[in-house]
Amino acid sequence: PAHFKNYIDMCDEESCHVMIKEIYEPHYERFGKYFGNTFRGFFSDEPCFANNIGSYYDTLGIPSLILPWRNYMIEMLAKRADLSAEEAELLLPGLWYEVSGKTSRLRYAYMETVTHLYRDNFSRMIGNWCRERGVLYIGHVIEDMNTHMRLGYGSGHFFRALDGQDMSGI
């Protein structure tokens, strides 16, 4: 959807660093003396991959769905799917279309890959930044309408997305 066109890239470490620098750091510079006492934490509300077409129900296998991707992911995907990098690359159309006998393994490996990147480059990064400054990282990962296990409005893997948070909120 159009409201996500300038949204952060959850898989990209640099993108998350920019978000911290531009949003979190100015708060710390201005209100640092209140961190850990008046300010108890930072709250993120429904962070997501934002790659959906407009429905909560978008899943892998929709031909027009844009998927989070970085070139280095092919090696990660191959390892998780127990394939060579060349095999994994040839099977990439299986993220959108059925590939006889290979679709499930490829899609599972893809979801594992992007949700680990989300955890490492978003949730843990923000959580570490907060704890280093004496505040909690509190967040609400959307879980309704089955988005807890999807991209789009979701974070791919509900519990992995919580990894890095000190507590959940609503």
Residues of each region from the PLM?
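Catalytic-domain carbohydrate-binding cleft regions of carbohydrate-active enzymes
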Residues: 1-170
